[in-house]
């Protein structure tokens, strides 16, 4: 049966969560108008004035979609509390995960290094989501203790945690893999992987994560395949995935806590911008993946399901969110792009 309108009442009732700064009266009027977006088949029946209003609403709707503000919520995290590590700015996947978690009914605490909080936009996100911001260096156990203690003061035990932390000085300095600076390599490991172990160890000792809770860390397929330019970050991601399995067994056995990693498509982020050839890799992955690249919004949605009770028996897994890229060998689009490039080189 065809729909008369593009959005139903139930689909727009979730919008107030995304617009807490707008007065209730204006917001209710906006939601009412949004319900009047017609299905395409009804467009010819609309009057001229109504069409003008609809046109404005389509522009607003496009803006919301572009900003990742959805008109659908399932309350998957209603009543749940969480900690998001690693949000820096709107380019961060962790930023979008934080927004989606709140849209789905959760209360959260945001954390990043003091420098990142000062130089980035985390305080703005905290204000928008009504979330406390706790500066902390995830490589230091005492500062991690402060984060979890603050969360427990605010919420009691937390239900979910996101680890979205990664940085390689060798990549930033343009060092080749066969010419690494080993002090910088250790820094890569400490920030990108060992911080995950420290986070889990501190949480377990404090008994900070509730029974049946969920921990997710973000990773990349370079942990298992060779990608030129990803450098020592590939080694760090391999370690990260191993920690998820090893700690997943212990935390699951003792406390029923789930630990998984999400292997995300190449995504434009502040951290990823330092990887040589990133834009070409994005194009290649888009051509190779049958569903195309998964973007930050897709990753956030996947993380939400892993935080929810719907995935209560999933743990110690490395889960690909990449449009099918990880299972592909070659696609017609990739072959065509390669052939075109070769033909251009031979001219």
Q: Model regions: which residues?
A:
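Conserved glycine-rich Rossmann-like NAD(P)H-binding loop of the short-chain dehydrogenase/reductase
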Residues: 106-122
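A short C-terminal helix-loop "cap" of Rossmann-like NAD(P)-dependent dehydrogenase/epimerase domains
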Residues: 127-128, 274-289, 338-346
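Canonical Rossmann dinucleotide-binding motif of NAD(H)/NADP(H)-dependent dehydrogenases/reductases
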Residues: 74-110
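Hydrophobic structural elements of the Rossmann-like NAD(P)H-binding subdomain
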Residues: 84, 162, 216, 259-262, ...
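C-terminal helical subdomain
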Residues: 194, 261, 279-314, 319-323, ...
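Short C-terminal tail/terminal secondary-structure segment
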Residues: 315-347
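Catalytic loop of short-chain dehydrogenase/reductase
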Residues: 86-93, 166-254, 263-269, 292, ...
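Conserved mid-core segment of classical short-chain dehydrogenase/reductases
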Residues: 123-127, 134-145, 149-153, 160-188, ...
